Amino acid sequence: MKVLNNLLYTGDHEWVRVEDNKAYIGISDCAQRMLSDIVFVELPEVDDEIAKGETFATIESVKAASDSYMPVSGTIVEINEELEDNPAALNEDPYGSWIAAIEMSDKSELEELIKPEVYEKICEELDKEA
């Protein structure tokens, strides 16, 4: 299981990569391992305004359908259309295969996200339980 040190994380297993006022959001390696083979991703629409905590994508796997929750508030400025044709990219490269990019409306919300070293411990505990 991989946790990247240049990202922030949520308790729902989304990752956030910040570039100025834009945040790229995807699911973690821990999430894709729990979901197993991903077969469909319902993406948000560009220009959608989404508040922190709202569902912004749905990921379906052979095991389950899982909502992804927006870690920060803002407006969707970009979506990863590759996932429409190749949802398994989230399994193959969870940190390279972002789901959406958002123009953040409140960067202070980033302070509530989980640091990599803490998130790694959370995932290790989940691995022990599995």
Swiss-Prot record:
The keyword Lipoprotein does not apply. It comes from the Bacteria. One of its GO terms (cellular component) is cytoplasm. Coiled coil: none annotated. Binds 1 lipoyl cofactor covalently. Gene3D superfamilies: 2.40.50.100. Its cofactor is (R)-lipoate. One of its GO terms (biological process) is glycine decarboxylation via glycine cleavage system. The modification N6-lipoyllysine is found at K63. Residues 22-103 form the Lipoyl-binding domain. The glycine cleavage system is composed of four proteins: P, T, L and H. The glycine cleavage system catalyzes the degradation of glycine. The H protein shuttles the methylamine group of glycine from the P protein to the T protein. Belongs to the GcvH family. This is Glycine cleavage system H protein. It comes from Clostridium botulinum (strain ATCC 19397 / Type A).
